[in-house]
A protein has these predicted regions:
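Short, conserved active-site loops that position catalytic residues or coordinate cofactors/metal ions
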Residues: 40-48
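Active-site regions of enzymes building and remodeling cell-envelope glycoconjugates
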Residues: 127-132
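Short, well-structured N-terminal submotif of metal-dependent ribonuclease cores
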Residues: 1-38, 54-70, 112, 121, ...
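Generic structural signal for small/hydrophobic residues in well-ordered secondary structure
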Residues: 8-9, 46, 90, 109
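Hydrophobic recognition helices of helix-based DNA-binding modules
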Residues: 5, 49-50, 116
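Alpha-helix capping/helix-boundary segments
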Residues: 10, 42-43, 86, 105, ...
């Protein structure tokens, strides 16, 4: 089974509102048959959005960052970083989607041949395996 990358909303839902995950997404994250990872890009995106207006539907705690990292570490879900090759790949992606965080996550999934857990309707325009 391919490694699975979680997009930012999948990270947030997994950690703070798992009932908002689709059944397929929850199964992929929890089934233990394949490796699951999340991106440092998600922490960056959450930090910027929290500084602006937050996520009113999710009511994140002040220590959201520590809870995400520690919670995923307990589950064996690793964090991946941003590499130069991911930055270069963003340049070559079609402009179907404008959000820079999502574009970087798409590039990471493409470059590493990961499947992606995402409810983003544009994700299938970039990736061949999107789970939701």
């Amino acid at each position: 089974m391919r490694t699975t990358l979680l997009d930012t909303m999948a990270v947030l839902r997994s950690c703070f509102r798992p009932e908002l995950l689709s059944r397929r997404a929850a199964e992929r994250i929890l089934d233990g048959r394949g490796s699951v990872v999340f991106s440092m890009v998600s922490l960056w995106e959450i930090g910027i959005k929290m500084a602006r207006s937050g996520y009113p539907d999710l009511e994140l705690p002040a220590d959201w960052d520590e809870r995400i990292v520690a919670g995923f570490a307990e589950q064996g879900i690793a964090m991946i970083g941003i590499e130069v090759k991911h930055c270069k790949m963003v340049e070559n992606l079609p402009m179907h989607h404008q959000d820079p965080f999502d574009r970087m996550i798409f590039a990471q999934a493409l470059q590493r041949d990961f499947s992606l857990v995402s409810s983003d309707l544009d994700a299938p325009l970039y990736l061949d395996e999107v789970i939701w």
